[in-house]
C-alpha cells in the first residue's frame, strides 16, 4: 500500500513538473531570457523611425527603442526587417518576439495582438503638391493618393475619405516613390517621414493637406503574454521618467515626446 502511494506521489510530481515546464515554455518573457536573445521586428524603409544608414546598419527611433529594451532585459538584440503589411504577421507566426515598427493601435489589430503603453509620438496626414487644393476629407474625393498597404494610413484613409482613389504599395519606399514619380497626386504618411523627404530634397513640391489622425506608437506583442507586456511597460515608464524617451524623440523627430498615453 505504501509502495502504491509512493508511486502515485511520484506520478503526481512528474505531471506537475511537466505542466510547470510547459507553462514556462509558453511564457514569452521566460523564453527570451533563457534564450538570451530578443527578436524584434523593425522598419528599414520608414525614416526617421527605421531606415538603413550608409554603413548598411539599421538606424532610427524604433531601432533605438529596440536597443533600449534589449539592454534593460540583459539580452542580445536580433533585428528583423519588416514592412507595413507583414509586421503584425511576424508576431502572429512567432517569427519575432516584439514588433517595434511605428505601430498604431486599432480595434482590428487588438483582436490579434497585444500592446505595450505608448513609446513614441506619431501623427498621420495626407501630403500633396502645393497646387492641389484639399482642405478636408470631402475634397480628397477623386484624388489619386498613394499609401502603404495594411498601414494605419491605409485604414484611416479608407474610412475617412472613401471617395479617394487609393493606390496601395507594398512598402513605404514604394508609396513615396509613386508620389515623387507622379503616379499619385498625393500620399498618406507620418509627418516625420514627410519632414525627412523635404529635408533630403527641399525642391520637392509638397504640403500637408489633411490630418488623418494623431496616434502614438506602441510595441506589439503576441496575444496572451501579460508578463512580457508588464515588463515592457516597466521599461517604457522608466525611460519616460529618466528623460530617455524625450531624448530619443528629440534626436529623431526634432522635439520631445511630451505626454504619451498609458
Predicted region positions:
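Ligand-binding clefts/hinges and TM-proximal coupling segments of bilobed small-molecule sensing domains
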Residues: 26-27, 152-169, 206-208, 236-262
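Extracytoplasmic small-molecule ligand-binding "clamshell" domains
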Residues: 25-102
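Acidic, polar ligand-binding/catalytic clefts
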Residues: 67, 71, 76-139, 203-205, ...
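Periplasmic-binding protein-like
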Residues: 120-128, 195-237, 255-262
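Alpha-to-beta junction loops
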Residues: 38-39, 74-76, 93-101, 162, ...
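Short helix-initiation/N-cap motifs at beta->coil->alpha
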Residues: 63, 78-89, 152, 167-177, ...
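Ligand-binding cleft/hinge of the Venus flytrap
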Residues: 51-54, 66-75, 137, 153-169, ...
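Extended ligand-binding regions for polar small-molecule ligands
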Residues: 63-72, 134, 138-139, 143-144, ...
